């Protein structure tokens, strides 16, 4: 520890936050912000015009694990709820007490002295954060064990003869013809876009209808850069595409057992898009060959984030598997019954059985304590007559290290990593989207690619930034048109002016986009203490160094000691460091990744885009003048 008198820089003490007394209202506020539960790749929103909107919406916090944060909300106070700081709320009483409304109102009013006393008691005992966190986490862990026990009890009941597999014999009888099946399969796949990405649209910029009515170079560029636009090919992933395609073709030609393929990479690196592009090419080739050439297969896609419970995968998979037969209608059966039907299908030897390629996106969301679901997924392809390929996609690079040994043994060693896009790849992607549109100058594309590649290498992020820049340029052009029209309508003016010509989108437009994103975040960061900002900076540095979204608590502590020693300031002790984590969790800057008591191996994840936080910390007055960029 460095003495404060000898420190070249001194900073205020670490902030402490009191426990939240607003149980009901904080829950409602969290639910309002949970509009995009299925999306992990939330991007920053521009400045909102609604002054009453929450700070979480202004900085574009994602709530993919909102349920886990809600479990801790009783222990940590959301320090950003400034509008309700002077109000205290309590849980509603029973409906029978409605007649005593006047008495209830009196009970809801507390003395200011009582509130301040509660706050002082909380701030004096910093270890309460540790105890409160552990108690809530242990409670959530017991709930998960109860759910697993209930699932096992239902399985035992079904094994007592309440379910008859014979009534579903038609599920295992596949048509040898397969023409109708192929048509249904192709029609279904035509509806699936290669680049189907669930995201929050950054283009929430109050565009006028006139922007889209005027068919100019800016609107065309925005359409070409939209995430839903389907390019004819995906540049920058040629090597990964060849590896995946070779694996699928080899298994299809064998036409017996299948295999497992694990694809890992940060969000926005083209994992799902690459697989879908390969499937589309194989289906087109199958159509040309009339279903021959060993390419007759059914493609099934399941997103783990769309399942309310991991065991729901069995029911969804069963219904999608039987859709190839028109005579079979989806049947309402339990997940346990669906599991038995699926297992029997993969075990039976049937030459007419169709090969299946199952893509499981957001695979890491299916992990439970016993890991039964993912064990079954990796076990099925290993059966001799399964005719099944499982392609598991996850955002976690070190997922195999978190799996149980029995699951690892079934998973195999087939892994395809997707590293973040570099500058050249991002430039190629943007230019390929624009094709012959001369909307951006060369410098603007280079700056956008460099800024994104330096932080996350997310192609979706780069495309959205360019779209936003096109919107800004279009708004400027519309203003020039308005002035031009008003001038021509003014008869007092002599002569006529030339019609404005759309100019190129420049680097200034790109920089303006980054400033719009960082403005609300900077306000949020200003409310944090110096050490809380350092804590976030440590997470950012580890994310950029390891390309893994989760960071171990012990790693953050080590990096904190290195940084504080370099800039000659005191390093927080373990208790203070844990309090920093609790404060940032209460402010929803970070997410606790699993339901276990915190320790040195505990995983912590940012709750907002890495590139936005990195840019905001670079602009922060407390950090930008310190030599910590290379730590």
Swiss-Prot record:
Keyword entries, A-Z: ATP-binding, DNA replication, DNA-binding, Magnesium, Metal-binding, Nucleotide-binding, Nucleus
Gene3D superfamilies according to UniProt: 1.10.8.60, P-loop containing nucleotide triphosphate hydrolases (3.40.50.300)
Ranges annotated as spanning the membrane: none
One protein family per Pfam: AAA_lid_10
Keyword tRNA processing: no
Region (Disordered): 1-164
Subcellular location field: Nucleus
One CC-aspect GO term: nucleus
Top-rank taxon, per record: Eukaryota
Acidic residues bias locations: 91-104, 141-160
Gene Ontology process terms (BP): DNA replication initiation; mitotic DNA replication checkpoint signaling
A Gene Ontology molecular function term of the record: DNA replication origin binding
Subunit relationships: ORC is composed of six subunits.
Function according to Swiss-Prot or TrEMBL: Component of the origin recognition complex (ORC) that binds origins of replication. DNA-binding is ATP-dependent, however specific DNA sequences that define origins of replication have not been identified so far. ORC is required to assemble the pre-replication complex necessary to initiate DNA replication.
Family the UniProt entry places it in: Belongs to the ORC1 family.
Designated name of the protein: Origin recognition complex subunit 1
């Amino acid at each position: 520890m460095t003495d404060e008198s000898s420190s070249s820089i001194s900073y205020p003490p670490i902030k402490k936050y009191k426990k939240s007394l607003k149980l009901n209202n904080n829950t409602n506020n969290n639910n309002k912000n949970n509009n995009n539960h299925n999306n992990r790749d939330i991007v920053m929103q521009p400045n909102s015009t609604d002054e009453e909107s929450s700070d979480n919406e202004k900085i574009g916090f994602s709530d993919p694990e909102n349920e886990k944060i809600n479990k801790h909300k009783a222990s940590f106070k959301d320090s950003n709820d400034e509008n309700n700081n002077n109000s205290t709320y309590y849980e509603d009483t029973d409906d029978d007490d409605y007649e005593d409304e006047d008495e209830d109102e009196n009970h809801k009013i507390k003395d200011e002295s009582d509130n301040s006393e509660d706050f002082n008691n909380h701030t004096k005992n910093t270890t309460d954060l540790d105890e409160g966190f552990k108690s809530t986490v242990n409670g959530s862990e017991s709930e998960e064990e109860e759910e697993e026990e209930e699932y096992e009890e239902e399985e035992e009941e079904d094994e007592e003869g309440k379910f008859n597999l014979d009534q579903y014999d038609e599920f295992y009888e596949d048509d040898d013809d397969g023409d109708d099946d192929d048509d249904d399969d192709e029609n279904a796949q035509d509806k699936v876009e290669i680049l189907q990405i669930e995201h929050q649209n950054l283009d929430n910029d109050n565009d006028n209808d006139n922007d889209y009515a005027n068919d100019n170079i800016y609107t065309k560029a925005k359409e070409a850069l939209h995430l839903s636009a389907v390019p004819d090919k995906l540049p920058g992933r040629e090597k990964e595409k060849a590896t995946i395609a070779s694996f699928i073709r080899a298994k299809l030609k064998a036409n017996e057992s299948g295999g497992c393929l694990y694809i890992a990479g940060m969000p926005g690196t083209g994992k799902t898009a690459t697989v879908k592009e390969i499937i589309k090419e194989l289906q087109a080739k199958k159509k040309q060959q009339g279903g021959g050439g060993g390419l007759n297969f059914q493609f099934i896609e399941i997103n783990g984030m769309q399942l309310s419970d991991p065991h729901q995968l069995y029911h969804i998979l069963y219904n999608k598997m039987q859709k190839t037969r028109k005579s079979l209608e989806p049947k309402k059966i339990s997940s346990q019954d669906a599991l038995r039907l699926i297992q029997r299908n993969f075990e039976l030897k049937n030459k007419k059985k169709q090969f299946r390629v199952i893509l499981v996106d957001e695979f890491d969301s299916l992990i439970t304590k016993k890991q039964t679901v993912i064990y079954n997924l990796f076990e099925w392809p290993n059966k001799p007559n399964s005719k099944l390929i499982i392609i598991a996609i996850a955002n976690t690079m070190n997922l195999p290290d978190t799996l149980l040994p029995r699951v690892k043994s079934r998973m195999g060693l087939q892994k395809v990593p997707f590293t973040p896009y570099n500058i050249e790849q991002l430039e190629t992607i943007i230019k390929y989207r624009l094709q012959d549109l001369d909307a951006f100058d060369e410098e603007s594309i280079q700056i956008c690619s460099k800024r994104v590649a330096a932080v996350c290498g997310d192609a979706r992020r780069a495309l959205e930034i360019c779209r936003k820049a096109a919107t800004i340029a279009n708004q400027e052009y519309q203003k020039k048109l308005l002035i031009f029209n008003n001038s021509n309508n003014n008869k007092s003016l002599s002569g006529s002016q030339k019609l404005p010509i759309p100019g190129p989108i420049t680097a200034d437009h790109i920089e303006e986009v980054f400033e719009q994103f960082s403005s609300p975040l900077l306000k949020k960061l200003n409310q944090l203490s110096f050490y809380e900002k350092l804590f976030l900076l440590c997470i950012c540095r580890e994310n950029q160094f390891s390309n893994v979204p989760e960071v171990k608590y012990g790693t953050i502590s080590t990096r904190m000691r290195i940084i504080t020693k370099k800039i000659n300031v005191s390093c927080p002790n373990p208790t203070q460091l844990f309090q920093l984590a609790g404060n940032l969790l209460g402010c929803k800057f970070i997410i606790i990744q699993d339901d276990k008591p915190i320790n040195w191996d505990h995983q912590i994840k940012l709750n907002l885009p890495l590139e936005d936080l990195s840019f905001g910390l670079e602009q922060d007055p407390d950090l930008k003048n310190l030599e910590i960029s290379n730590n």
